[in-house]
Amino acid sequence: WAENGFRQVTNSKREIPTPEDVKGLRLRVVGSPIFIDTFRQLGADPVNMNWGDAVTAFQQGVVDGQENPVGVLVPVQIWQYHKYSTFWNYLVDPVIFYWNKKQWNTFPKDIQKIIREAAQEAGRFEIALCRAGLDGDKSLNILKNEFNHVMEVPEPVKFMESKGMTVTFLSDKGRQAFIDATKPLYEKWVPKIGEDLYKNALSDRGK
């Protein structure tokens, strides 16, 4: 597996150090029901729209903010629309490699091994790419030493701040406040997702 990075929230109104600060904000979110439920639980007004419509809504002041990983925030130059960004790591975007089992079984074992190793390598590269500059030098060194890749923006937070954004990081206590505020969602969604899958996801968290 790989990932697109941890999703952060940006907006044009205020910093968001506590769950109470989310209340009343109109935010563009992914159309998945669990995303919408999360922001409604926090008191926001989540809106599902494509990115082109979202940019127009930001410019017109119809929508206050959005949520996306840093790997999206920098390329779209989010500072053109929003002054505030809160790094709360509320969700990580997993990228899972799938293959048709029937077709997979037609490959010789040595080809399966090559494909599997290539997928693992691609996943390691993607994870490092999305975490670069956010975990000290760890991911930057992986990219440089293993893949001969140098990031154009090696320190995304400082880069965003240089563009005039205020970037807020949550303390452990602050992050726990958001966890507590969204606990009712666990009761709703864990049975739907499956207890085993939920526990496996928790055990893989941070790897």
What are these regions (language model features)?
Residues 1-207:
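N-terminal secretory/targeting leader peptides
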